[in-house]
């Protein structure tokens, strides 16, 4: 069972209690923590769309600490980030691996950050399937198509050429924050919030 801290605020109508994530959502901060799967992705997409409806001009901050997860779930978050009008800044704290690193790279150019001890990992998608030979062939084609799509997304957001992205994603490729900056996944390694304010 996961315990979620509650925050109590004084209002003109008395006290109001929020879970910590709802309170942070009021500040336009979205957390992506843990494995990326369908239910979590639906919640993140809903938060992005809600914040756009509330103020389409104001920046949204996405904090990422994730080992990755289901590709289609991650792509639903990615597509929504690109679809909505507000700029989405991304910040890695802890780790951004697999789909987590793709979402980190997908932030607004110039607004993609990582803390100094963050770990970023990119790799090609994996999949296992059992069944009839024809079904295995269908799924093999699908995973190759997904691999190609993910490569194209990394090319778009890192500025690297396709052969370089393909070579770097052939196996699990772990990076420190500085290396992720050199590769183009993030724009800046930050130690303090002031570093973000100075870069904007």
From Swiss-Prot:
GO terms for molecular function: ATP-dependent peptidase activity; ATPase binding; serine-type endopeptidase activity. Pfam families: CLP_protease. GO terms for biological process: protein quality control for misfolded or incompletely synthesized proteins. GO terms for cellular component: cytoplasm; endopeptidase Clp complex. SUPFAM superfamilies: ClpP/crotonase. It comes from the Bacteria. PANTHER family: ATP-DEPENDENT CLP PROTEASE PROTEOLYTIC SUBUNIT (PTHR10381:SF70). This is ATP-dependent Clp protease proteolytic subunit. The lineage of its organism: Bacteria, Pseudomonadati, Pseudomonadota, Alphaproteobacteria, Rickettsiales.
């Amino acid at each position: 069972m996961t315990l979620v801290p509650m925050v109590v605020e004084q209002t003109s109508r008395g006290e109001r209690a929020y879970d910590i994530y709802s309170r942070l959502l009021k500040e336009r901060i979205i957390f992506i923590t843990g494995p990326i799967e369908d239910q979590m992705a639906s919640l993140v997409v809903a938060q992005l769309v809600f914040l756009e409806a509330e103020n389409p001009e104001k920046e949204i901050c996405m904090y990422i600490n994730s080992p990755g997860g289901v590709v289609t779930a991650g792509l639903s978050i990615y597509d929504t980030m690109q679809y909505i009008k507000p700029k989405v800044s991304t910040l890695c704290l802890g780790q951004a691996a697999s789909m987590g690193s793709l979402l980190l790279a997908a932030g607004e150019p110039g607004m993609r950050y990582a803390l100094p001890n963050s770990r970023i990992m990119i790799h090609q998608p994996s999949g296992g399937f059992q069944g009839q030979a024809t079904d295995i062939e269908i799924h093999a084609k699908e995973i190759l198509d997904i691999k190609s799509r993910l490569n194209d997304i990394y090319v778009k957001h890192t500025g690297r050429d396709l052969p370089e992205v393909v070579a770097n994603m052939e196996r699990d490729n772990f990076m420190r924050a500085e290396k992720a900056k050199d590769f183009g996944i993030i724009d800046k390694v930050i130690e303090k919030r002031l570093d973000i304010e100075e870069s904007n």
